[in-house]
């Protein structure tokens, strides 16, 4: 298996392989305008997928992905505006999943894990100012997120 997008200016931050012939790697293009990036391994080669980002995103980076099958993945990251975002894969395309933090402050979810398509947990941080940073978690039930502060 060769590295995705060899020679391109990209950063890959997370990977999930639901089978030996299916892997998804997520990250961002490392350009001034930025943009989320998903690479998919089909057992023979990597291919790029486009992902939607929130309308007001100033920079988009997917930080983590978790796949329960080749047809079900959830990826989380940072949209550069005051907010986090998530994308889901349904086997044919990526779709934006609405998500907010508890305080509406700048945030980034950096990890996600899914036990099933309807049971995922994400972890990250939000901050209004450097001195007020705090951890946050969110739980996905397949329909919506429930955000909670961590201890």
Where do the PLM segments sit?
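Residue-level hotspots at or immediately adjacent to binding/recognition sites across diverse folds
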Residues: 1-151
């Amino acid at each position: 298996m060769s590295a995705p997008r060899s020679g391109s200016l990209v950063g890959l931050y997370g990977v999930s392989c639901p089978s030996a012939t299916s892997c998804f790697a997520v990250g961002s293009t490392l350009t001034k305008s930025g943009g989320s990036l998903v690479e998919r391994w089909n057992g023979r080669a990597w291919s790029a997928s486009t992902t939607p980002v929130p309308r007001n995103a100033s920079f988009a980076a997917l930080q983590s992905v978790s796949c329960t099958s080749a047809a079900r993945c959830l990826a989380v990251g940072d949209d550069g505006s005051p907010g986090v975002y998530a994308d889901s894969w349904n086997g044919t395309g990526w779709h934006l999943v609405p998500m907010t933090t508890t305080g509406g402050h700048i945030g980034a979810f950096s990890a996600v894990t899914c036990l099933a398509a309807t049971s995922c947990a994400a972890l990250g941080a939000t901050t209004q100012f450097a001195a007020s940073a705090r951890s946050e978690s969110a739980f996905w039930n397949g329909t919506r997120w429930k955000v909670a502060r961590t201890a």
